[in-house]
From Swiss-Prot:
It is a single-pass membrane protein. The gene is HUR1. This is Putative uncharacterized protein HUR1. GO terms for biological process: DNA replication; double-strand break repair via nonhomologous end joining; homologous recombination; macroautophagy. It comes from the Eukaryota. It is found in: Membrane. Its main location: membrane. The chain crosses the membrane at residues 18-34. One of its GO terms (cellular component) is membrane. Disruption phenotype: No increased sensitivity to hydroxyurea. Keywords: Membrane, Transmembrane, Transmembrane helix.
Length: 110
């Protein structure tokens, strides 16, 4: 699992930094995973997650999985999985999503 995560992280880094326009306008899925302290694979659910609460979630957790894919030609759906319990949380659709590296984790910016 950890090796797969490392490969995804490396591919994601190359994809976003070498081909930023392609990564924004293709339907290629994107996954980023941080390893929690002894609790790998746990997720969290929140109701109506907003961009502001997403930032707070990222700051408060050492583990999250971010994946996005196009719902249609103009919108993107983003899912956020975190380590506190066993459900899934959804971020509202963005027309453009950019992922930045900060303090060892990926953070979404509009």
């Amino acid at each position: 699992m950890f090796i797969l995560v490392s490969v995804v992280n490396i591919c994601t880094y190359i994809h976003l930094h070498m081909f930023p326009l392609i990564s924004t306008f293709t339907s290629i899925g994107l996954g980023v995973l941080m390893k929690d302290k002894g609790k790998e694979g746990k997720t969290i659910k929140a109701q109506n997650v907003t961009y502001q609460t997403f930032e707070k979630y990222v700051e408060s957790s050492s583990f999250f999985f971010l994946v996005h894919n196009f719902l249609n030609s103009s919108t993107m759906k983003t899912l956020l999985l975190m380590s506190n319990n066993n459900s899934i949380s959804e971020i509202p659709s963005f027309s453009v999503l950019k992922i930045l590296w900060k303090n060892g984790i990926y953070i979404a910016h509009i």
